Amino acid sequence: MIDRPIHVIGGGLAGTEAAWQIAQAGIPVILHEMRPIRSSPAHHSQFLAELVCSNSFGAMAVDRATGLLHEELRRLNSLVIAQADQHSVPAGGALAVDRGVFSRNLTEILANHPLVTLKRQEITEIPRDGIVVLTTGPLTSAALAADLQNFAGLDYLSFFDAASPIILGESIDRSIAFLASRYDKGEAAYLNCPMDREQYLHFWQELKQAEQAELKDFERENAKFFEACLPIEELASRGEDTMRFGPLKPVGLADPRYPDQRPYAVIQLRMEDKAGQLWNMVGFQTNLKWGEQTRVFRLIPGLEKAEFVRMGVMHKNTFINSPQLLSSSLQFKSRPTLLAAGQLIGTEGYTAAAAGGWLAGTNAARLALGLETVTLPTTTMMGSLFEFISSAEPKHFQPMPPNFGILPNFTRKIRNKRERYGQYADRSLQDLEAWMNQLKTPCLV
């Protein structure tokens, strides 16, 4: 019997899942949640796993990225997904829940578990010893964020998420977009989408008129962050040529189709993953509504059929530079007994938060039992997501949702997208079952 408890800090989806996995392994766990002693600007109740935005966990079909992640978690006995299934409400092809009942039941389950102690208190410092799981989310309290920054390093904690859209590489028209670096310096590292004057002016006008998302009050108060990383629509509003002398400058780039004529403007895309399946729109951090982003950005030559795996966002979001700090087991490299999960590590979405909680909780339990920590196969959605956030380029790291672009390709080309995604799902679930069967213990811990 292990007497020393594991501490889980933060009672959101990730923390709830982590605490459950630890307790189910027979290890005492203290789950710290500051509400209702201290609330955040986005929360409205004292319940664990409160859903502060939508009540939807995303698409259910396994040929959708979130649906595949749901199914992986079901097979791994996730408490969060089991409760989402139990308290689901009709939502077409999505897994949506009665949010009040969902959060209340999860709170009761954890509070009634004999090995779980629920402590309502604000934690202002990371415990310096023992096994600890950080799951404090995007609205981590100022005091704890300051301590985390001291631990991680000044440059490895972000407080505002200003991210450009990310596009699936196969949806980019390579007959228009060309690989090159400015002035041909170094390796051809960017995909470039050239515009003539007419195309640029049309794009500029549509961008100026596009509808923006509403900022929450606490985000509006932090608008000073925008000056350091201006939205592309703000640049457009400052004049016809502002973008052309900023991120859309054409200097040093020649369109191979018209080598003697410099483009009027160029949108650059930077590779987001080692396999070149994901591409980031350089300088296109934006606060446009998602539908408007799709409409306006598909006006760019070469991106007419672009598939966005992540939309641009600008909002308050505390997250660490995971590639610099974490391994794919979600342990801190500098302190393996400290783990983290949820939006704090740069994953996006409810289901990804639960997945991170599952892995961090499982590995925390394994550490307590003297077992080696585990990582999932990278052919699974869970495994590929945590491999991505722990191995992406640290300099440009931004949060990432589950998507098929981070999975390894098949050796043979499958042109039909739905068929390809279905085969990704089949491979993932087969590899997950094989991985589970290889573990020597009766359960994962």
Swiss-Prot record:
PROSITE patterns to which the protein is assigned, alphabetical: GIDA_2 (PS01281)
A molecular function GO annotation: tRNA (uracil(54)-C5)-methyltransferase activity, 5,10-methylenetetrahydrofolate-dependent
Domain of life according to the entry: Bacteria
Cofactors, names only: FAD
One GO cellular component term noted in the UniProt record for this chain: cytosol
Location of the protein in the cell: Cytoplasm
EC code: 2.1.1.74
Alphabetical UniProt keywords: Cytoplasm, FAD, Flavoprotein, Methyltransferase, NAD, NADP, Transferase, tRNA processing
Main localization, broad class: cytoplasm
GO biological process, one term: tRNA wobble uridine modification
Keyword Cell cycle: no
Pfam families: GIDA (PF01134)
InterPro entries noted in UniProt: FAD/NAD-bd_sf, MnmG-rel, MnmG-rel_CS, MnmG_N, TrmFO
Record-linked PANTHER family: GLUCOSE INHIBITED DIVISION PROTEIN A, METHYLENETETRAHYDROFOLATE--TRNA-(URACIL-5-)-METHYLTRANSFERASE TRMFO
Family of this protein: Belongs to the MnmG family. TrmFO subfamily.
Function: Catalyzes the folate-dependent formation of 5-methyl-uridine at position 54 (M-5-U54) in all tRNAs.
Name of protein: Methylenetetrahydrofolate--tRNA-(uracil-5-)-methyltransferase TrmFO
